[in-house]
């Protein structure tokens, strides 16, 4: 599994090592796209990630993208889906996408979402159906959205995990010099922003 932070020469070295090995596939983890992905996976440079991803795909190396779908994935999921569709259009079945839901930590799980977040997820699922994803990829995302809708936290449990989420965000920004509201400008404007 890779986050594609390695240099171009190391990507080429990897390609040279595996190009003749049958059934080789590289898995890369990313949970959103753009500045949101960079916030979630601190240290990620999305342009570098994309360049390395394209380098591998262009040389015929199959890549599986693993998006561990969490609360922070929701805000920019449409851009992630569009980018994956763009790459799938260019490279076909060399690129696969899997979007299982995150269960823990609970305060980052999409189970803390509200109705506006559910709407974003449902709309993004409709968008995904318009692009060249496989039936299996769409159904896995449909399952993720369905599971989140059926398992949203309620009552005291919801309040606790949302408070823990905001405590996490504040500590993340303090320790890493990041800015949640810059990375997620819309997330702070919908849902439970008033709880901050």
Spell out what each predicted region is.
Residues 1-10, 17-50, 62-71, 94-108:
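Core AdoMet radical
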Residues 20-21, 52-63, 87, 91, ...:
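A structural motif corresponding to the C-terminal end of an alpha-helix
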Residues 69-75, 91-125, 138-146:
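Flexible glycine/acidic-rich beta-alpha junction loops that bind and position SAM and/or redox cofactors
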Residues 71-87:
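Catalytic cores of alpha/beta
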Residues 127-196:
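Radical SAM enzyme core and accessory elements
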